[in-house]
């Protein structure tokens, strides 16, 4: 080891202390460390933590004089899994680790919410690559011995020390996969124009635009006349379609763009198979069709990929699928080219159209949109159709694919009458460029034998006359709000958007929870000059907001279930808080709860506090099972906490325990409520289908989204109402002959809303009938006019491009402030890459062979470039071969921009945020400058 290396290791010691747990590499350092030193380091970790242990380790390390210890240290880091730290020390470039600091800071301030929201066991497999193997084992051990909150705290501690540059994004993907509400707060974002540069730089291919839309998952049930249970093993055989399914498929098989609107449970998935098979077989020899089927959610994507594969691979067609979970590891262009049928989540195609991986929609001959009622606003479906309609209205000579939409309800939006409903449906048809709405008309009798429409009943019930439980919890919430207010007063003029705009009367509502989430998001991004104070304030506010959210949940449970269930929910939360090891704020909040606990216990067991809603629900269930002991029931509720509470109530109620309830919830997680995996959902449904003793299924909205559920003759909506589309879905669960559907609520407005939904359904059906009587040419002209109008609006709504700033500015190295180039020398390549022309710039950087050389289109990535100053070596970008030229591609995030006239300096994370005159690359400017990189000392 040289003296310079020793000095550097001492200088960069803070990075080692913040990252390394030395106990994980001590076994690899045995040749250099004495036993007493090893024991001293281990004791330091046990007593003071890994940072102090790393400091002691570094002290011993720098005192070593034996030959080879530095190489041994690097090898130990590699073997233990500290690859990022090892790479940084080898190159003395800690920029990648430094860039993680903003995410560490964000995670520190989000820690209170993380530990109350996340189940570490569920996301650990997804993020294990970002941790050391021993850390994963420690997290699991703590989960088992101390509980999930303590395990989540340990996971945060480990992530804060991770040296893996991709851990923030890996965590984001894991949270999204588990549909965790925490993912809304974990903000890891990249602009669309920068994605391509990142593709070249980091081999990442994702954008992260998250929007929430209503979804109806495709059903497997009633696919055909010889359909069988999804749980029964069988060899796939061709299915025989029903007459109404052939009727639904006919317009599409005749080549017309069509919306297929048919009830849940009738087998729309099977109809899409019929259309797809007919489409592929119609092409003459020498030509081939190419179908893309869009599914919005990952479970639906997986289900449809399986269904299409089983049906079409026996016919010799190649079926492939690409989702957000797989797009990083596959070549989208190649899969699309080599497959006959591609199942996609729609954002994948949006990304590919944006970056040019797929040049246009003309590569497809048929597009099928599942849940097509979502084709509005900025939903990926609509973005895809914008591209389609721009080509159509622009007179492109390229052939466009046939378009098919599938839905149980087209909806009517805010329509007040049949004319407005007709206009709304026409707009949906215009968005999908469809001139036919296919419904079952000639074979209604057969459809009604498959899908029965239940009778609808409304039950208005009363609330408790007095609610002491709510009064006590509301008082605790007001105290917490006061504590939070004192934090805001400490901030002085700095505010986060007005904490106290929500009145106490909103406790126990969804509106109050939305406000909590809003405050948490604002806390996550606000900044102060004093970073320690900023961290302390953010952490305190997150603790207060987390407790307010739990109390809010408890009030909702109390309103709709037993006080006992709400109290149990709170006790579970505080039990987990204690097991996790709480700070002073949490100790104070826990003490406040415990002071009221005895009174809450007494109130919760008082029979006079029984919930009138449960009394009425018990009466309905007893009455229906008395009339028909074979009744099968689905009970819809709003939240997972209510699912658990009502299950406990039924099991503990001697009048209802014979129902043997099972539960079905979604895959995401909220607070203490753990979501169900896809296999767990299937297991519940199979049991409900086959076990006659299991008479009631309690579920959230997941069951109105097309999951394959056995026929039921009783549907109960317990304070559960949505829009007209959701109403049709939930009602569709009552499929048995003679079915009944009850809406049970204490809120008269919900009954009015459901009646309005029924009226809107009539309007929708009437509007569809009107449109089906229109002459097709008239209908086409109508939607064409809508398309033209919408395109004009869309074009005019585009953000105006800022006037380019033509003043010349300097780019300085962000690390050492060395001069790099002038903006006048920067040229834009393919709209998203930026190079610098002129030989002078080549003297200001050095290069090293790229560890992952790769080609993308016209670009071959060859080397990394760094600031030429020996004491800097800051990462500036990459060196590429573009067509016939060798050139650098620089990253604006690596530089400081200085205004020559004023001396003002600014930084920009993305090129699109930097306003200057962006001149396009001209090959003539490269004359004489296209020397090979090897002449400049490749490998410097």
From Swiss-Prot:
User: Which PANTHER family does the protein's record reference?
Assistant: ANTIVIRAL INNATE IMMUNE RESPONSE RECEPTOR RIG-I, HELICASE WITH DEATH DOMAIN-RELATED
Q: Which InterPro entries does this entry report, sorted A to Z?
A: CARD_dom, CARD_RIG-I_r2, DEAD/DEAH_box_helicase_dom, DEATH-like_dom_sf, Helicase_ATP-bd, Helicase_C-like, P-loop_NTPase, RIG-I-like_C
Found, by tissue, as follows: Ubiquitously expressed, with highest levels in spleen, liver, intestine and heart. Up-regulated in tracheobronchial lymph node and tonsils during porcine reproductive and respiratory syndrome virus (PRRSV) infection.
For this chain, the annotated S-S bridges are: none
Q: RLR CTR domain spans which residues?
A: 795-928
**A GO cellular component entry from the record:** cytoplasm
Q: Which gene encodes it?
A: RIGI
Name the job this protein performs: Innate immune receptor that senses cytoplasmic viral nucleic acids and activates a downstream signaling cascade leading to the production of type I interferons and pro-inflammatory cytokines. Forms a ribonucleoprotein complex with viral RNAs on which it homooligomerizes to form filaments. The homooligomerization allows the recruitment of RNF135 an E3 ubiquitin-protein ligase that activates and amplifies the RIG-I-mediated antiviral signaling in an RNA length-dependent manner through ubiquitination-dependent and -independent mechanisms.
Q: What does the subunit section of this Swiss-Prot or TrEMBL entry state? A: Monomer; maintained as a monomer in an autoinhibited state. Upon binding of viral RNAs and conformational shift, homooligomerizes and forms filaments on these molecules. Interacts (via tandem CARD domain) with MAVS/IPS1 promoting its filamentation. Interacts with DHX58/LGP2, IKBKE, TBK1 and STING1. Interacts (via CARD domain) with TRIM25 (via SPRY domain). Interacts (double-stranded RNA-bound oligomeric form) with RNF135 (homodimer); involved in RNA length-dependent activation of the RIG-I signaling pathway. Interacts with CYLD.
**Organism annotation:** Sus scrofa (Pig)
- Helicase ATP-binding domain boundaries: 249-428
User: What top-level class of enzyme does the UniProt entry assign?
Assistant: hydrolase
Q: Where in the cell is it found?
A: Cytoplasm; Cell projection, Ruffle membrane; Cytoplasm, Cytoskeleton; Cell junction, Tight junction
Q: Which residues form the CARD domain?
A: 1-87, 92-172
Catalytic activity annotation: ATP + H2O = ADP + phosphate + H(+)
Q: Where is this motif: DECH box?
A: 370-373
Which ranges carry the Helicase C-terminal domain? 613-779
The UniProt keyword set, sorted, is:
Acetylation, Antiviral defense, ATP-binding, Cell junction, Cell membrane, Cell projection, Cytoplasm, Cytoskeleton, Helicase, Hydrolase, Immunity, Innate immunity, Isopeptide bond, Membrane, Metal-binding, Nucleotide-binding, Phosphoprotein, Repeat, RNA-binding, Tight junction, Ubl conjugation, Zinc
* Position of the Glycyl lysine isopeptide (Lys-Gly) (interchain with G-Cter in ubiquitin) cross-link: 48, 96, 154, 164, 172, 190, 815
Residues that coordinate or bind Zn(2+): 813, 816, 867, 872
What domain of life does the native source organism fall in?
Answer: Eukaryota
Know the name of this protein? Answer: Antiviral innate immune response receptor RIG-I
Q: Where is this region: Mediates interaction with RNF135?
A: 738-928
Q: What is known of its domains?
A: The RLR CTR domain controls homooligomerization and interaction with MAVS/IPS1. In the absence of viral infection, the protein is maintained as a monomer in an autoinhibited state with the CARD domains masked through intramolecular interactions with the RLR CTR domain. Upon binding to viral RNA and ubiquitination by RNF135, a conformational change releases the autoinhibition promoting further homooligomerization, interaction of the CARD domains with the adapter protein MAVS/IPS1 and activation of the downstream RIG-I signaling pathway. The helicase domain is responsible for dsRNA recognition.
